[in-house]
């Protein structure tokens, strides 16, 4: 169980990092990133990546408003 939790923490860190890169305008090939993941991890990773992208875009919009 602990190994699985560590894996999810690592995947979450990677999803956040790639979302930050995307928000900075750097190219991110999400298919290449997730290419070797099994379906369960790929689905989870892509959902987290999309969530972080959304959060970062909302934060950027708030910065531009002020």
Swiss-Prot record:
Any GO BP annotation: negative regulation of single-species biofilm formation
Superkingdom as given in the UniProt entry: Bacteria
Pfam assignment, any one: GlgS
HAMAP family in the record: GlgS
Family recorded in the similarity comment: Belongs to the GlgS family.
Protein function: Major determinant of cell surface composition. Negatively regulates motility, adhesion and synthesis of biofilm exopolysaccharides.
Annotated protein name in UniProt: Surface composition regulator
Encoding gene, per UniProt annotation: glgS
């Amino acid at each position: 169980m602990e190994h699985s939790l560590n894996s999810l923490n690592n995947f979450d860190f990677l999803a956040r990092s790639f979302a930050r890169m995307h928000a900075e305008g750097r190219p991110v090939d999400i298919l290449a990133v997730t290419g070797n993941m099994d379906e369960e991890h790929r689905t989870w990773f892509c959902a987290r990546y999309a969530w972080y992208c959304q959060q970062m875009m909302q934060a950027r919009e708030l910065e531009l408003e002020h």
